[in-house]
UniProtKB/Swiss-Prot annotation:
Residues 622-690 form the S1 motif domain. This is Polyribonucleotide nucleotidyltransferase. Gene3D superfamilies: GHMP Kinase, N-terminal domain (3.30.230.70), K Homology domain, type 1 (3.30.1370.10), Nucleic acid-binding proteins (2.40.50.140). The lineage of its organism: Bacteria, Pseudomonadati, Pseudomonadota, Gammaproteobacteria, Enterobacterales. Keywords: Cytoplasm, Magnesium, Metal-binding, Nucleotidyltransferase, RNA-binding, Transferase. Residues 553-612 form the KH domain. Mg(2+) binds at D486, D492. Pfam families: KH_1 (PF00013), PNPase (PF03726), RNase_PH (PF01138), RNase_PH_C (PF03725), S1 (PF00575). One of its GO terms (molecular function) is RNA binding. One of its GO terms (biological process) is mRNA catabolic process. Its cofactor is Mg(2+).
Length: 711
């Protein structure tokens, strides 16, 4: 029989329900988590045995949103969900990052977490719900996992921190921060902010971590009631004798290799040392496991780098702990792009471009939480050549999507409002070289490229990656980390912002025991680094260019009476289509009567504005217009005036004499002066050529063509 076990608790302004034992009973563990009608079903399956020769931990996290959760049918051709969207990929990463460090070292059994959104309240984002669900399911499963974790979203409204703000509240918030951690320590932070101070950001992290303890307590209570027995897993016993033998052969040589400052040269030397050491040991005993030897060598390598940093010795590339690598900053490097920059920091380099488009270039995102339009796009590409490798080139991978999102967050706070700068902006960062923190190089490059494109950003922004090496109470915070320092260190801490404050903060911590004080030191050290980089960037370009590129569309905005929108659009869009073809511009009309005309040529834009003004102008009774004959009928002629509006010139109003035949006086396409006699209630216009010519005397009334008179 189905025997659901349920726990309910209050979490900020929301009620959270954890339920297990009802569904997916063949999975290792399954939990349905709901928070005020947003429900996510999370399952965990772990393999009891590791695959032979497995040398890494194969953890997979899948997050999938079902449109039925919002009471909708997918809009795709096949009417079913397809591959993960960018948003789903980002949330999968958000779940993965805090749980991955909590599996014990040496655990290489396959584990898969699947989170499925099955119901959604548009005010409650499913990401926090999914993170709580993954934590609960892993804790219930019996798989070796040093959790549970809690997760919280923190907003900052009216100088107050807000726990798990609703979507409406987030629109008013200066901060959107997600923090996850265990009972004792923060493990992950992901945030964007409107240039808040270091203290405000740190306060938000501490607030979120304190508030999420209620989640951890309730998951622990659920585990007591419904948890499965802990797996009897033990790490492989350490072969002390083999470790000592490998260290004797390789430690001193690896220590020397890590004094080589050039990355490629260092990697080549390390590879030689490893292969020679393994060859020597296999020659002594062919029964040794090559994978095990590789792991021992990696541990020695890690220890060499860490111990040198903790001893206060220079880093791998010879720098002190708070030194930034050499910077090279150039703008306007590509002639035909709207804005471009090449930003180089040591062996990390980004070629960044900015492209301006119109509102119709904006991306319409049909998300579970509702449809929204994104007018600022940021794409990050990491080709294999950037690290001197060959590999697949194609659609962006999870890492590229995640890094692009982080870089976008770094720049978003300084982007101008649409009413001040009505362009869709796309930034693309091509990583051409990489050795540490290419996402932060993308932030710096984006700031430069946007200024080069003439985008009036509120301030220049720069980003920096910090690292940490900690043993016991001894720790060192490193500025501008290399790839190796990221890989071998205990924390990856990325901060982007302007001179005035932080726009984005991302933190991934691999160990417990990172205190508030350590985070404070890292944030303050990052501020110094950020200000140094901004100083160098300002030497290349210190303000947005006064004008946009000659190759970018210029958007001119005019306002018309909303009642006249139908006249500009025309039947089935005929008028606006003809206008865009005639003027060579792009025209967009909003419901409030705002008309945006985009053109690369100023004269074309002026022509389009003039034509729209003609179409929307009120026809004045008694005024004389120049019109064009569009139709000739027995009882008169129709003449187009004022932007395509047609009026009738009755046969009696063509000349001051009796007209027997209209074609004796008028031809199709002929331009004639006409006076407006009347506009009736239905908008029909009566015109007169006779009165217009009388008014403009000494000009005579139109004469019949000479040939016809002579007949």
């Amino acid at each position: 029989m189905l025997n659901p076990i349920v726990r309910k608790f209050q979490y900020g302004q929301h009620t959270v329900t954890l339920e297990t034992g009802m569904m997916a009973r063949q999975a290792t563990a399954a939990v349905m988590v709901s928070m005020d009608d947003t429900a996510v079903f999370v399952t965990v399956v772990g393999q009891k045995k590791a695959k032979p020769g497995q040398d890494f931990f194969p953890l997979t996290v899948n997050y999938q949103e079902r449109t039925y959760a919002a009471g909708r049918i997918p809009g795709s051709f096949f009417r079913r969900e397809g591959r993960p969207s960018e948003g789903e990929t980002l949330i999968a990463r958000l779940i993965d990052r805090p749980i991955r460090p909590l599996f014990p070292e040496g655990f290489v059994n396959e584990v898969q977490v699947i989170a499925t959104v099955v119901s959604v309240n548009p005010q409650v984002n499913p990401d926090i719900v999914a993170m709580i669900g993954a934590s609960a399911a892993l804790s219930l499963s019996g798989i070796p996992f040093n959790g549970p974790i809690g997760a919280a979203r923190v907003g900052y409204i009216n100088d107050q921190y807000v726990l798990n703000p609703t979507q409406d509240e987030l629109k008013e918030s200066k901060l959107d921060l997600v923090v996850a951690g265990t009972e004792a320590a923060v493990l992950m932070v992901e945030s964007e902010a409107e240039l808040l101070s270091e203290d405000q950001m740190l306060g938000a992290v501490v607030f979120g971590h304190e508030q999420q303890q209620v989640v951890i307590q309730n998951i622990n209570e659920l585990v007591k009631e419904a948890g499965k027995p802990r797996w009897d897993w033990q790490p492989e016993p350490v072969n002390e004798a083999l470790n000592a033998r490998v260290a004797a052969l390789a430690e001193a040589r690896l220590s020397d290799a890590y004094r080589i400052t050039d990355k490629q040269e260092r990697y080549a030397q390390v590879d030689v040392i490893k292969s020679e050491t393994i060859a020597t040991l296999l020659a002594e005993d062919e029964n040794l496991d090559e994978n095990e030897l590789g792991e021992i060598l990696h541990a020695i390598e890690k220890n060499v780098v860490r111990s040198r940093v903790l001893a206060g010795e220079p880093r791998i590339d010879g720098r002190e702990k708070d030194m930034i690598r050499g910077l090279d900053v150039r703008t306007g490097v590509l002639p035909r792009t709207h804005g471009s920059a090449l930003f180089t920091r040591g062996e990390t380099q980004a070629l960044v471009t900015a492209t301006l488009g119109t509102a119709r270039d904006a991306q319409v995102l049909d998300e579970l939480m509702g449809e929204r339009t994104d007018t600022f796009l940021f794409h990050y590409n990491f080709p294999p050549y950037s690290v001197g490798e060959t590999g697949m080139v194609g659609s962006p991978k999870r890492r590229e999507i995640g890094h692009g999102r982080l870089a976008k967050r770094g720049v978003l706070a300084v982007m101008p409002d649409m009413d001040k700068f009505p362009y869709t902006v796309r930034v693309v960062s091509e990583i051409t070289e990489s050795n540490g923190s290419s996402s932060m190089a993308s932030v710096c490059g984006a700031s430069l490229a946007l200024m080069d494109a003439g985008v009036p950003i509120k301030a220049a922004v720069a980003g920096i990656a910090m690292g940490l090496v900690k043993e016991g109470d001894n720790y060192v915070v490193l500025s501008d980390i290399l790839g190796d320092e990221d890989h071998l260190g205990d924390m990856d801490f990325k901060v982007a912002g302007s001179r005035d404050g932080i726009s984005a903060l991302q933190m991934d911590i691999k160990i417990e025991g990172i205190t508030k004080e350590i985070m404070q030191v890292a944030l303050n050290q990052a501020k110094g680094a950020r200000l140094h980089i901004l100083g160098v960037m300002e030497q290349a370009i210190n303000a947005p260019r006064g004008d946009i590129s000659e190759f970018a569309p210029r958007i001119h905005t005019i306002k018309i009476n909303p009642d006249k929108i139908k006249d500009v659009i025309g039947k089935g869009g005929s008028v606006i289509r003809a206008l865009t073809e005639e003027t060579g511009t792009t025209i967009e009309i909003e419901d409030d009567g705002t008309v945006k005309i985009a053109a690369t040529d100023g004269e074309k834009a002026k022509h389009a504005i003039r034509r729209i003004e003609e179409i929307t102008a009120e026809i004045e009774v008694g005024r004389v217009y120049t019109g064009k004959v569009t139709r000739i009928v027995d009882f008169g002629a129709f003449v187009a005036i004022g932007g395509g509006k047609e009026g009738l010139v009755h046969i009696s109003q063509i000349a001051d004499k009796r007209v027997e035949k209209v074609t004796d006086y008028l031809q199709m396409g002929q331009e004639v002066p006409v006076k407006v006699l009347e506009v009736d209630r239905q908008g029909r216009i009566r015109l007169s050529i006779k009165e217009a010519t009388e008014q403009s005397q000494p000009a005579a009334a139109p004469e019949a063509p000479a040939a016809e008179q002579g007949e």
